[in-house]
A protein has these predicted regions:
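Bacterial N-terminal signal peptides
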Residues: 8-16
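Sec/Tat signal peptide C-region and signal peptidase I cleavage site
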Residues: 18-23
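Active-site- and interface-proximal helix/loop "cap" or "latch" segments in soluble metabolic
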Residues: 24-150, 157-266
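Positively charged n-region of N-terminal signal peptides that target proteins for export
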Residues: 1-8
Length: 266
């Protein structure tokens, strides 16, 4: 009797494992984003497409706290340069993406203690950020189909500077037609740190009860992700809003640059 019970438990565990695996490989688009910006200013993202139960496409990219376009765009344009013999970041990232498609499982990557790998030819960059996010993405629910026609990273910078010398920027990530991430920032006409970084350092201070600019801005970003359309952001005549808890900063400029960025996605 004990042997039969043990056998039944084993069968149940096997089928349970198969079931979990099947759920993890449901067809669809999967997304994950890092929790915070790194010391170099990057926050990484992973986008994985599953079709027929298999990973058919993987994208690794990064957004930044500098008010600039995504990492792949900057690397391809020569703005973000490593001068590595193996190629620039976007070239190496593509090899890592291809390896995930080959392996079909991010846990199968061989990652060293320094977050790099010797197992992928032509790759000298750290890859742990991607492998961790790929695991996280595949463990989450697929991204629901959204209203936008194109996926990708959409950036826009205001052509004008405000009275404080800042020009607002928006970098929006769209997956399966859905906004999954929004990044609001501003660059100064004199150069130097972005508004977000200045706020973090305490160089740009508001002394607001709701928090400094870098604290309030993510609340506005989260609202756009929730609403899915910058046109739905409620803005008063003074450029502020009463519709987002903990936000006293003006948001009109974000509404404008986000709408401009997303024109290319519609």
């Amino acid at each position: 009797m004990k042997k039969i019970t043990a056998a039944l438990i084993l069968i149940a565990l096997v089928f349970g494992a198969v079931s979990v695996g099947a759920q993890a490989r449901r067809d669809g688009f999967y997304f994950a984003e890092g929790k915070e910006f790194s010391r170099s200013g990057w926050k990484y993202q992973a986008v994985i497409e599953v079709k027929g139960g298999k990973i058919v496409k993987a994208e690794w990219n990064g957004i930044n706290n500098l008010g600039q376009p995504d990492k792949k765009t900057q690397a391809a344009a020569g703005v973000y340069r490593m001068n590595a013999p193996q190629g620039e970041w976007h070239v190496q990232a593509a090899r890592v993406e291809a390896e995930l498609i080959r392996l079909q499982d991010p846990t199968k990557f061989v990652v060293k203690a320094d977050a790099k790998t010797d197992a992928i030819s032509g790759v000298s960059i750290t890859i742990k950020e991607f492998t961790d996010l790929a695991v996280q993405a595949l463990a989450s629910a697929p991204v629901a189909k959204g209203m936008y026609k194109k996926d990708g990273w959409f950036y826009f910078k205001s052509p004008t500077f405000d009275n404080s010398g800042f020009a607002s920027t928006a970098l929006i990530t769209v997956v399966n037609g859905t906004i999954v991430s929004a990044n609001w920032n501003a660059v100064h006409r004199a150069g130097g740190d972005s508004k977000f970084v200045r706020a973090v350092k305490g160089a740009y201070k508001m002394n607001a009860k709701q928090g400094e600019w870098h604290v309030q801005a993510p609340r506005v970003e989260a609202e756009l992700v929730k609403l899915q359309d910058p046109a739905k952001l409620s803005v008063k005549s003074d450029g502020k809003t009463d519709a987002i808890s903990g936000v006293s900063i003006t948001i009109a400029e974000f509404k404008t640059v986000a709408a401009e960025a997303l024109k290319a996605a519609r």
